[in-house]
Amino acid sequence: MEYKTPFIAKKLGVSPKAVVRIAQQLNLTIEKNKYGHFIFTQDDLDQMLEYHRSQIEQSQNTHPTQKTSSNDVEELKTQVNTIVQNISSHDFEQLAAQLNTITRRLDRMEEQMQDKANDVVTYQLLQHRREMEEMLERIQKLEAGLKKEEPIYITPDTKPTYEREKKPKRRKMIFSIFGL
């Protein structure tokens, strides 16, 4: 029977990439179907299951579960403290120096960003000022043009708007067809 990679991955409880990796480690000849999918036989599946089980057993044997006593924990704490004390003074100085250089760089970058923001705002203000001056010039030209021309008088209508002629209502097309 033929099996595809996802099926074997489910059986082993690993990802499809891990299945291909296991097959390569076992030097299995993997065939591909016309779509490029890997095809495994029953023998390949059995070999991979055995290999996977042996790997799991080896990992469990190399990492046996140990019960730690309070004495062991105390010993580890003292070892860690001595290591930290020995390394601390020199490493902390290096870390402090690195931190200072990083903060200086950040300050410089913030200043540069602030300068750029100020430049952008200044440019926008100048552009708005230029636009306002152009609009002021246009208004002055229009005023001068109006002063040269004859005064324009606006005469009110003789009839108020509510007394004006009303447009005839449009009849809907269906009503006109049926003569309603």
From Swiss-Prot:
Residues 5-25 bind DNA. GO terms for biological process: asymmetric cell division; chromosome condensation; chromosome segregation; sporulation resulting in formation of a cellular spore. The keyword ATP-binding does not apply. It is found in: Cytoplasm. SUPFAM superfamilies: Influenza hemagglutinin (stalk). Residues 90-150 form a coiled coil. It comes from the Bacteria. Required for the formation of axial filaments and for anchoring the origin regions at the cell poles in sporulating cells, thus ensuring proper chromosome segregation in the prespore. Binds in a dispersed manner throughout the chromosome but preferentially to sites clustered in the origin portion of the chromosome, causing condensation of the chromosome and its remodeling into an elongated, anchored structure. This is Chromosome-anchoring protein RacA. It comes from Bacillus anthracis. The gene is racA. GO terms for molecular function: double-stranded DNA binding. Signal peptide: none annotated.
